[in-house]
């Protein structure tokens, strides 16, 4: 906030007030200061202070502090020292007193953001499943995004590492903090009851990820409402949801499908992660808790794969507007994740991503592709090119592609690729078919799809037939 000096203000001391390190408007003949509106370039605010005398000692010298302590004017007006950058920003105001003594005022203002052009991204975990995914993201020290959790269960929220101010309890009157009891209608009404606080939490966002586990009460019912509020505010809204394992029961499966249909209508892009698909990624001896943790980790990788492209300065710069161009109103999307090590790690990671069990249908039909390659400091341009060849040879030549490359020293010797394929909804609607029909057709032939090589115990990578039949690459070699 800017500090203004009234034109009728007359300083009690004979010395004139001037702005530190800035030019000041001259005083009028009555000795009154004109209004001063000078912005300090470092702190982006108006500052006012006493004019330095000609014999002013050098700042930070012992003599300087000694003269300050002996100056009655500065003792009477400590705010002048604060505005000079000397001393603390806490001021005791002798003009304001209470029964307990003088009032202590803090004149320090919040500093301006270092880069006001940075896209503000928020990840909102809704319900128990969404909150668990957010908790896992925080544990992995994921940066560049702001984490929130939304729930009707106050006890579960208290166990989260999310900042207390970013824990949003909804439906206080309806649920009294006891949860939704697995009823999506209660979750939906709880979100509607708390619409104003949800809008306040979303305010100022450029992009919002709404993550939820479908099939329960709060996530299934509240996530579509929250996503709809975000989209109505003009925020790029991406939904990432998991569907329940088959062993969780038919009731949760039916509720999950209804929740997905509602969520799809309220987001720009929806990425669905079927938990049953993850069964192909684990061994038969995998504990149940580890299987659920794997689902949370897939959610984390999906969010990070997109957000890293925007927030982390990489080898290839990608603007937020580029990502918006592909993901806005994109409809249903698919995600593939691949990781590999070894001599051909980049190409293997790309193959693993396009053969991921999370991909119900091939990415050939996508109208937009967002993909990100992350490697250690030893990642080479040749490896980036090798991964790009695999992906670019497969997708439609007219598809819009966004590519990001990020160097993470923690991934030394390893390459990870996250691929988001979008635009299936628009393409299928143009052909007079629905996304659900396409997904159903893919599910009916899903048994014939070759499982991802990244999850084979042997670790070998086999080039799929559709790549063997491809001709020369459209992507230039290094």
Swiss-Prot record:
A Pfam family this chain is assigned to: FtsZ_C
Binding annotation for GTP: 128-132, 217-219, 248, 252, 296
CDD domains found in the cross-reference section: FtsZ_type1
Post-translational modification (record): Filaments containing FTSZ2-1 are stabilized when in complex with GTP but destabilized after conversion of GTP into GDP; ARC6 conteracts this destabilisation by preventing the dissociation of GDP-bound FTSZ2 molecules thus inhibiting filament disassembly whereas ARC3 promotes GTPase activity thus accelerating the conversion of GTP into GDP and triggering FtsZ2 filaments disassembly. Phosphorylation at Ser-143 is necessary for interactions with ARC3, ARC6, FTSZ1 and FTSZ2-2. Phosphorylations at Ser-143 and Thr-286 are required for the formation of contractile ring at the chloroplast midpoint.
Role description: Exhibits GTPase activity which converts GTP ligands to GDP. Component of the plastid division machinery consisting in a binary fission accomplished by the simultaneous constriction of the FtsZ ring on the stromal side of the inner envelope membrane, and the ARC5 ring on the cytosolic side of the outer envelope membrane. Required for plastid division in a dose-dependent manner.
Family stated for the protein in its record: Belongs to the FtsZ family.
Name of the protein this chain belongs to: Cell division protein FtsZ homolog 2-1, chloroplastic
């Amino acid at each position: 906030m800017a500090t203004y000096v009234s034109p009728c203000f007359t300083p009690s001391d004979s010395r004139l007030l001037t702005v530190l390190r800035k030019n000041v408007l001259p005083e009028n003949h009555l000795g009154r200061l004109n209004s001063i509106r000078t912005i300090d370039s470092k702190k982006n605010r108006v500052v006012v202070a006493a004019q330095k005398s000609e014999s002013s000692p050098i700042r930070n010298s012992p003599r300087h502090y000694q003269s300050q302590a002996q100056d009655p004017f500065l003792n009477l007006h400590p705010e002048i020292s604060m505005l000079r950058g000397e001393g603390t920003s806490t001021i005791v105001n002798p003009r304001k007193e209470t029964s307990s003594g003088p009032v202590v005022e803090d004149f320090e203002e919040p500093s301006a953001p270092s880069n006001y052009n940075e896209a503000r991204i928020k990840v909102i975990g809704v319900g128990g499943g969404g909150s668990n995914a957010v908790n896992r993201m925080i544990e992995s020290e994921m940066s560049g995004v702001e984490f929130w959790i939304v729930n009707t269960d106050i006890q579960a929220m208290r166990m989260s590492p999310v900042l207390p101010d970013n824990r949003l309890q909804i439906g206080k009157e309806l649920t009294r903090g006891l949860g939704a009891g697995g009823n999506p209608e209660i979750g939906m009404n709880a979100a509607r009851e708390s619409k104003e606080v949800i809008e306040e939490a979303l305010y100022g966002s450029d992009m919002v990820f709404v993550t939820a586990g479908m099939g329960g009460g709060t996530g299934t019912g509240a996530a579509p409402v929250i996503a709809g509020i975000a989209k109505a505010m003009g925020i790029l809204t991406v939904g990432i949801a998991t569907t329940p394992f088959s062993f969780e029961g038919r009731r949760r499966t039916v509720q999950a499908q209804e929740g997905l249909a509602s969520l799809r209508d309220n987001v720009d892009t929806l990425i669905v992660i079927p938990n049953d698909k993850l069964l192909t990624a684990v061994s038969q001896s995998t504990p149940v808790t580890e299987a659920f943790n794997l689902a949370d980790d897939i959610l984390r990788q999906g969010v990070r794969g997109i957000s890293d492209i925007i927030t982390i300065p990489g080898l290839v710069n990608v603007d937020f507007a580029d990502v918006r161009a592909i993901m806005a109103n994109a409809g249903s999307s698919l995600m593939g994740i691949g990781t590999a090590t070894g001599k051909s790690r980049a190409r293997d990671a790309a193959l693993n991503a396009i053969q991921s069990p999370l991909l119900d249908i091939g990415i050939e039909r996508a109208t937009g592709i967002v993909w990100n390659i992350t490697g250690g400091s030893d990642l080479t341009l040749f490896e980036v090119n090798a991964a790009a060849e695999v992906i670019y040879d497969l997708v439609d030549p007219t598809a819009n592609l966004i590519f990001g490359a990020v160097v993470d020293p923690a991934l030394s010797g390893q390459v990870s690729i996250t691929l988001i394929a979008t635009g299936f909804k628009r393409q299928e609607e143009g052909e007079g078919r629905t996304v659900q029909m396409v997904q159903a057709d893919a599910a009916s032939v899903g048994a014939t799809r070759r499982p991802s090589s990244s999850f084979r115990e042997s670790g070998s990578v086999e080039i799929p037939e559709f790549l063997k039949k491809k001709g020369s690459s459209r992507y230039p070699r290094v």
